[in-house]
Amino acid sequence: MKSIDILPDDILLEVFEFCMDQNQTLISKTEWWQSLVHVCRRWRCVVFRSSRCLRLRLRCTPKTPVRDTLDIWPPFPLVVDNIAGPTEDMDNIVAALERRDRVDRIHLYEVNGSSFEKVLAEMQEPFPELMFLYLELSSKEELVPIVPDSFLGRSAPRLRVLLLEGILFPGLPKLLLSATNLVDLYLWNIPHSGYISPDVVVTALSTLTSLQRLDLGFRSPRSHPDQASRLPPHPTHTVLPSLTTIFFKGVCEYLDDLVARIDAPQLNNLYIMFFNDVVFDAPQFIQFISRTPTLKAVENAHVVFGHLKAIINSSSRYEVGISCRELDWQVSSLEQLCSSHFPPLSTLEDLYIYERLYGEQPDWQDNIENTLWLELLHRFTTVKNLYLSKEFAQRIVAALQELVGGRTTEVLPTLQNIFLEEVEPGGHVQEDIGRIVAARQLSGHTITVSHWKRDLMRERDLFRW
């Protein structure tokens, strides 16, 4: 067998690059090369000489003796993280942050209040090489520390990814004006005391021409625009030319005000979760969808009911849900969403209705009025194919068979096929569906009933919430 030692340096480097690409996690990506440099002097020279193309990093954790060991290595960029687990001992993290001219990635999650203040104290000056920043305050903290305006020296020119969760940062819009290379922006679990108005958000986004993903999520439904101060629709829109994905969690009025001010011609994915509300009125959202080509046509929809939420998903690209527990509230809320064109249904042909089979299972009662189901189904006027799980077949078929005489096609007028996950022979569902088929046949509308085998793996991958 030929020895690897006969390989020239350029081929050896390609082997090392291949090894680098096989390491998927942050930990493995930052530590894989350290074993190579201890093999022999030649390997060490090849690795160190090619540090830029191999993207060599030094990882600093709460357990890394930074002050004792960091200078042993060449001055590679630093990755500062507590991925192995949150801790109150942040001395080594703080020591790593002192090397601000070398830090290019910070990933700190579930940081408690006192530790967070120590981190903030070391981040008031510019971090000129910083490209990735993830800060998550512990969800157990009742008093949220305020990030001062001087954070990062008010400048982040190389930052590409910014994730802030549970963070109170009034000066964020000013910082974003300097982050012109930002690709992903995640602002999640925003405290009510840290409310940012839609107008301020859009102003901050206006300079982010490279932004591809925006996640904006509020902690409470109290975070909503003041009705008295809501502005009329803007005659011009801020164009976000690179934006492809939006995640939003909040109230309907906020989303409506936000999209009234923007255009996103490349938007392919839109995922929305509303807090429970009585009315969903979003005229500007409808206009936004009409000028977003990739989201106008919806061919199939999955209506899914779960423990704490109900969701409508369209082709994995467009998802809107409502946070509430009781099934009757979920059905009623989805009907209101559909009536407000969340999502647009004029081109819909395939409708799936089922329960979520993973996660905590709900304890639903069989006391939902049939009229609630009929009101929801009434919104799907173009559906040709209806897919029903065992859990919901009995409920929905019972509601449909109440439509007799001239009302048989009042709901789902273009229906051609019903697909059932499972039906007990001779059971009530089979009898009721026979009546529905017969009644439709008399009115000149033929319906075929078939078996549906659910694709559980696809269901798991389908939803983002």
What role is predicted for each listed range?
Residues M1-W465:
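Leucine-rich repeat
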